[in-house]
Amino acid sequence: MLKSVLTLVAMLSTFTASANTTYTLQASYEHKTQDSYEYQALKLALDKTTADYGPYKLKVTDEPVPPSRFIIEANAQSKENFIFVDSVNKEYVEQLSHANFPVLLGIIGYRIPLVSSDLKSRGYTISSREELMTYSMIQGKGWLDTDILKDNGFKVHTGKYIEGLFHMVAAERGNFFPIGASQITTAIQNFKHVEGLSIDDKILLYYPLPRFYFMGNKNIGKMARVEYGLKLAYEDGSLQKLWQQHFLQAIASVNMEQRKLFKFNNKYIRNIDRSYEQYIYNPFKNN
């Protein structure tokens, strides 16, 4: 059934797609873009749809576009068919076109806290939501996560600079600094010069934080191709294989399935098509 629906979408969208379509992906800040999961997943989706949509070119922006300019650049078309990955929010959905598929299979929504080594050594017990709410959080100023945590009733301490957030939690200027489960081991390694950092080993926070591919609002047909390709890749297992190559080692090291899970709401995705939820990774599925 899924394959027949996706094939129909592809056939309808093919009429609006041009031959040898160019996609220009947002450059990575941290490493070579071509080595990133976001680049490789997009390439996989485009490869899967070549038979229906024709050849393509996948380029990368010369420099990373600041997130504050994503909407402007996408709709201005100054960069040929600019495409980027980011967490879903109301502004993106209203002003851009998107592929309704969680590119990272929702792993960023699972958050594991960094804590101070002193707090961890003193010990703490969190067995209920009420107990968890007595602890304060640390997040970046202006981050979507900050708003989500505040909306759910947490006291949140904010900082402007990334490194400063690690110093804040180490100095207990807040209790927990939740980071994406797939990112936390890399974060600890990158900021190992900050003394007094530890990874909590008790809890796992979750709020839906899907990351979609976005393009300008006139690129609905091109986005349909990407969504179709991602779903084909998921259906045949090739996307999960790629995802595991990039993230499985990192998430295995933090024992997600052994933690106590606390779920929270994200009101900023209230009006999007929830069919993406079937593709969200569940670390407790086999428990």
Which role does the model predict for each range below?
Residues 107-112, 118, 189-227, 249-271, ...:
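Periplasmic-binding protein-like
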